[in-house]
């Protein structure tokens, strides 16, 4: 597919996300949380759109991507709580960010694919990745500790 055409996405890609232990992302009290997949578990649908302005961002970190939640419509963004970068879910539409004249770094993640897994690094806080704890149910966070206490590799399942 032509990269330029791909950047002019008409609508977001829809995905369910899980870690390699089959813990899926759900929305629980307006917080993105990873929980073990069970028969009744309904994963949240994540929306993804590429950033149109690649020349203003770092290269070789992955594809700059806006991430959101389909219902209720909201978007992921990174901010600071004191000195600590944190992951937040806020009101908004990733289509609006996609259509802005410049990148919205707080809401951009470098999506890097490796085989069947993906990582999501904050564009606003390089070196900080979306992560979940290694066991049980837990909210999504940002971490710099790759593959140690937290899981940063996720599988993306296409939603039709």
UniProtKB/Swiss-Prot annotation:
One of its GO terms (biological process) is positive regulation of interleukin-6 production. The keyword Transcription regulation does not apply. The modification 3'-nitrotyrosine is found at residue 98. It is found in: Cytoplasm; Secreted. InterPro entries: IL-1_fam, IL-1RA/IL-36, IL1/FGF. Highly expressed in embryonic tissue and in tissues containing epithelial cells. Elevated expression levels are detected in chronic kidney disease; expressed inepithelia from the distal convoluted tubules (DCTs) to the cortical collecting ducts (CCDs) in single nephrons (at protein level). Keywords: Cytokine, Cytoplasm, Immunity, Inflammatory response, Innate immunity, Nitration, Secreted. N-terminal truncation leads to a dramatic enhancement of its activity (>1000-fold). GO terms for cellular component: cytoplasm; extracellular space. Residues 1-7 form a propeptide. The keyword Cytoplasm applies. Induction: By IL-22 in normal and psoriasis-like skin. Its main location: cytoplasm. Interacts with TMED10; the interaction mediates the translocation from the cytoplasm into the ERGIC (endoplasmic reticulum-Golgi intermediate compartment) and thereby secretion. Belongs to the IL-1 family. Cytokine that binds to and signals through the IL1RL2/IL-36R receptor which in turn activates NF-kappa-B and MAPK signaling pathways in target cells linked to a pro-inflammatory response. Part of the IL-36 signaling system that is thought to be present in epithelial barriers and to take part in local inflammatory response; similar to the IL-1 system with which it shares the coreceptor IL1RAP. Seems to be involved in skin inflammatory response by acting on keratinocytes, dendritic cells and indirectly on T-cells to drive tissue infiltration, cell maturation and cell proliferation. PANTHER family: INTERLEUKIN-1 FAMILY MEMBER (PTHR10078), INTERLEUKIN-36 ALPHA (PTHR10078:SF25). This is Interleukin-36 alpha. It comes from Mus musculus (Mouse).
